[in-house]
């Protein structure tokens, strides 16, 4: 190459036999995708109705709150962990008396 710019005459291509281990992969192989009907349908997750009884979250309130939920086994366990952890439910009377940031 002479000069700062490359010209077509300066490019020399050497074509040699390609080694078998570096052959390109044929992306259009004989593989076929299954039809939607052939794919397995996900089984319906079993949901069970639960009645949850939890105390009001205010310190001086004796009210027991009843909540009815329809949940999976995993969902009801997660809800149980929330209720025994950081989440506290309030009764309607205590909701008006407690200070809260939400509406």
Swiss-Prot record:
Subunit structure: Homodimer. Homooligomer. Interacts with host RB1; this interaction induces dissociation of RB1-E2F1 complex thereby disrupting RB1 activity. Interacts with host EP300; this interaction represses EP300 transcriptional activity. Interacts with protein E2; this interaction inhibits E7 oncogenic activity. Interacts with host TMEM173/STING; this interaction impairs the ability of TMEM173/STING to sense cytosolic DNA and promote the production of type I interferon (IFN-alpha and IFN-beta).
The keyword Thylakoid is annotated on this UniProt entry: no
Localization of this protein: Host cytoplasm; Host nucleus
HAMAP family: PPV_E7 (MF_04004)
InterPro entries: Papilloma_E7 (IPR000148)
Written domain comment of the UniProt record: The E7 terminal domain is an intrinsically disordered domain, whose flexibility and conformational transitions confer target adaptability to the oncoprotein. It allows adaptation to a variety of protein targets and exposes the PEST degradation sequence that regulates its turnover in the cell.
Chain span(s) of sequence motif Nuclear export signal: 76-84
A molecular function (GO) term: DNA binding
Chain location of the short sequence motif LXCXE motif per the record: 27-31
Biological role stated in the UniProt entry: Plays a role in viral genome replication by driving entry of quiescent cells into the cell cycle. Stimulation of progression from G1 to S phase allows the virus to efficiently use the cellular DNA replicating machinery to achieve viral genome replication. E7 protein has both transforming and trans-activating activities. Induces the disassembly of the E2F1 transcription factor from RB1, with subsequent transcriptional activation of E2F1-regulated S-phase genes. Interferes with host histone deacetylation mediated by HDAC1 and HDAC2, leading to transcription activation.
GO CC annotation terms, alphabetical: host cell cytoplasm; host cell nucleus
Zinc finger residue ranges, unnamed: 56-94
Superkingdom: Viruses
Alphabetical keyword list: Activator, DNA-binding, Early protein, G1/S host cell cycle checkpoint dysregulation by virus, Host cytoplasm, Host nucleus, Host-virus interaction, Inhibition of host innate immune response by virus, Inhibition of host interferon signaling pathway by virus, Interferon antiviral system evasion, Metal-binding, Modulation of host cell cycle by virus, Oncogene, Transcription, Transcription regulation, Viral immunoevasion, Zinc, Zinc-finger
Gene3D superfamilies found in the cross-reference section: 3.30.160.330
Name used for this protein in its record: Protein E7
